[in-house]
Amino acid sequence: MEFPKNLRYSEEHEWVRVEGNKAYIGITSFAQAELGDIVFVELPEVGATIQQDEPFGSVESVKTVSELYAPVTGKVVEVNGELEDAPELVNSSPYEQAWMIVVELSDTAELDKLMDADKYEAMVKE
């Protein structure tokens, strides 16, 4: 199971990749493995505001429905429309093709509350 070093991670198993004042958000390889085959992804609309630690969408697998929790606060500026037709990308490419949303960061200090790859890996191994 991989946890790219250039990402930050939340306790709820979301990842964040920061590019300038924008953050790409998705779920980790650990989360998709726990969920099993993803069959549907529900995401917010462009223009919506998400709040750190609050639900912003959900993923449905053959096993369960799981809420997605915002790792940062911001305004949604892009949604990955590919996931509507191909939710299985979350299983096959959780860090590359299956980013879920892009937000304009409201407060970069929130990133300090997230874990680096080593801390996240230690948490999921407990």
Swiss-Prot record:
GO terms for biological process: glycine decarboxylation via glycine cleavage system. The glycine cleavage system catalyzes the degradation of glycine. The H protein shuttles the methylamine group of glycine from the P protein to the T protein. Is also involved in protein lipoylation via its role as an octanoyl/lipoyl carrier protein intermediate. This is Glycine cleavage system H protein. Residues 22-104 form the Lipoyl-binding domain. Transmembrane segments: none annotated. One of its GO terms (cellular component) is cytosol. It comes from the Bacteria. PANTHER family: GLYCINE CLEAVAGE SYSTEM H PROTEIN, GLYCINE CLEAVAGE SYSTEM H PROTEIN-RELATED. Keywords: Lipoyl. Belongs to the GcvH family. Its cofactor is (R)-lipoate. The modification N6-lipoyllysine is found at K63. The glycine cleavage system is composed of four proteins: P, T, L and H. InterPro entries: 2-oxoA_DH_lipoyl-BS, Biotin_lipoyl, GCV_H, GCV_H/Fam206, GCV_H_sub, Single_hybrid_motif. Binds 1 lipoyl cofactor covalently.
